[in-house]
Amino acid sequence: MFKSLTGFLLLLVATFAQADRIRDLTTVQGVRENSLIGYGLVVGLDGTGDQTTQTPFTTQSLNNMLSQLGITVPAGTNMQLKNVAAVMVTASYPAFARQGQAIDVVVSSMGNAKSLRGGTLLMTPLKGVDNQVYALAQGNILIGGAGASAGGSSVQVNQLNGGRITNGAVIERELPTQFGSGNTINLQLNNDDFTLAQQIADTINRARGYGSAVPLDARTVQVRAPTGGSSQVQLLAGIQNLEVNVAVQDAKVIINSRTGSVVMNREVALDSCAVAQGNLSVTVNQQANVSQPNTPFGGGQTVVTPQTQIDMRQSGGALQRVTSSANLNSVVRALNALGATPMDLMSILQSMQSAGCLRAKLEII
């Protein structure tokens, strides 16, 4: 029996796939989403909006909006609002989007609002990097979190200051596209791989004739195509469903330093090595001792004396042998046998790679 690292060691064990479709391995160069951003106001909050004395931009935005609606707020008016919040609105402009198409938007508080639950986003223009308005957003916000507070205590589940509006924005301006204007199409691999790029080109050449595709580098495969959008759509519809026998992947271990999760693929292998690990813990405990003199008529003074205790413990440290492991199951058994915590495992893997015992690329994100 070996101790399971479930909960902090995530292992993705993939079965051998006979072939993958080109559509799953590549994307079409130039066919992508674009980011949109806007600033707006959320109203209708149940007393959980911005504190306007601490967020003057909320009051300024509200005054500007009211003036556009023909309502003038007297100068010097100190509006104490609790149902309004200033927010940033973001969205992704999909490729080939057409005027009138609805897209989802994400609404995020930028002030000190406690919650956006029950709020309504007022009409907000969404702009691109060229400062042009491409969509208008408005609607009721859906919040995935919940919270309650009373008597100085509070409970909160998930995030309350951010939400989503499904189909909350409408495209008002279309982006020009160069799709169909040239006589070539570039397929971009999801991951750099010279072998896979050559295999994709060979597969396309077998299906459409020699010279139809050529790998430009480890990420790009160029395909000859007829001009015209409809002709290139027909070409891609046939190419993307072709299957490619994927070669052996690079052995790779990914470590997330923030969450402590470790992910490795099936190509990871270990060489024999010995590992010693130890944990050093320091505990500091401080108590206040009150010393009161037993002289009620002598004018004594009560004195508070701090008493500090420091405890230092070191555990572990014994050498443990790690046997050679050629497959993922053996690697899992070898690492589980160490009984290491997630943070220990991160350090052990780094040391193994430095010692030449970990036959894999180590990436820390």
From Swiss-Prot:
GO terms for cellular component: bacterial-type flagellum basal body, distal rod, P ring; outer membrane-bounded periplasmic space. Assembles around the rod to form the L-ring and probably protects the motor/basal body from shearing forces during rotation. The lineage of its organism: Bacteria, Pseudomonadati, Pseudomonadota, Gammaproteobacteria, Enterobacterales. The basal body constitutes a major portion of the flagellar organelle and consists of four rings (L,P,S, and M) mounted on a central rod. PANTHER family: FLAGELLAR P-RING PERIPLASMIC PROTEIN FLGI (PTHR30381), FLAGELLAR P-RING PROTEIN (PTHR30381:SF0). This is Flagellar P-ring protein. GO terms for biological process: bacterial-type flagellum-dependent cell motility. Belongs to the FlgI family. HAMAP family: FlgI (MF_00416). Its main location: periplasm. It comes from Cronobacter sakazakii (strain ATCC BAA-894). It comes from the Bacteria. Keywords: Bacterial flagellum, Periplasm, Signal. InterPro entries: Flag_FlgI (IPR001782). Residues 1-19 form the signal peptide. Pfam families: FlgI. GO terms for molecular function: structural molecule activity. It is found in: Periplasm; Bacterial flagellum basal body.
